[in-house]
């Protein structure tokens, strides 16, 4: 489903990713964690071409992401992305936020797109807010809208880049609950997060990054019970204290 082979990336002279390789199979949930500046967000953004790379190959569902021939807009319509900040259009209502890309990118009929949007708002517990504007919703609600918007495109996989890090603590669980449901329904997911409770609950594997390298790529239980590197042990000791 998702394959990264020997991926390296530089910003000028500074190397942000070094020889990163991993695979995410269909239906797998892989959590990517590590200290700030370790390259986690950059790695996940390479998967749908938001961050170009200078070396290596990236494939999603058989499409080579970093090929000049690839239609990235088409690829991104199949790979949902949820960011740290919700990236909703402030001048559009919630349901309009959910229908816009369906109509413009997937060429769906407006009525069908609206129906799909309302159905997914119901799924994330926000059907009553369909005609409100983003500023009228809490951060947790806006992030749930962002997840619903990505799901409207019928993605084959979902990428999450620290989806709860901009939220107040009491709003984190309402977003994680939606993500847990998605995982349990079999959605293929790559998730950059510090929420280790979420990782323990639904991850199949955990990738630990440091200084632009994948240091560990282990089954969840093995990572938490017996991390191989001192750097990962130190990270877990601090985050699970």
Q: Where would I find each of the regions flagged by the language model?
A:
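ABC family nucleotide-binding domain
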Residues: 1-220
């Amino acid at each position: 489903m998702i394959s990264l082979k020997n991926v390296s990336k530089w910003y000028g002279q500074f190397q942000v990713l070094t020889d990163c390789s991993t695979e995410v199979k269909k239906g797998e949930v892989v959590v990517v964690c590590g200290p700030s500046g370790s390259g986690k967000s950059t790695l996940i953004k390479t998967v749908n071409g938001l961050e170009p790379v200078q070396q290596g190959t990236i494939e999603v569902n058989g499409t080579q992401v970093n090929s000049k021939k690839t239609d990235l807009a088409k690829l991104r319509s199949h790979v949902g992305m949820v960011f740290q900040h919700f990236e909703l259009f402030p001048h559009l209502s919630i349901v309009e936020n959910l229908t816009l890309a369906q109509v413009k990118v997937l060429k769906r009929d407006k009525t069908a797109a609206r129906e799909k949007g309302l159905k997914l708002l119901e799924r994330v517990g926000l059907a009553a807010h369909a005609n409100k504007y983003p500023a009228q919703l809490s951060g947790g609600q806006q992030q749930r809208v962002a997840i619903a918007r990505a799901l409207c495109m019928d993605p084959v996989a979902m990428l999450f880049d620290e989806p709860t890090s901009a939220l107040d603590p009491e709003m984190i669980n309402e977003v994680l609950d939606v993500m847990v449901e998605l995982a349990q329904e079999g959605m293929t997911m790559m998730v950059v997060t510090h929420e280790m409770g979420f990782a323990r609950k639904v991850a199949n594997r955990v990738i630990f990054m440091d200084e632009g390298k994948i240091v560990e790529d282990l089954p969840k239980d093995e990572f938490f019970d017996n991390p191989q590197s001192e750097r990962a042990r130190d990270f877990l000791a601090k985050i699970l204290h």
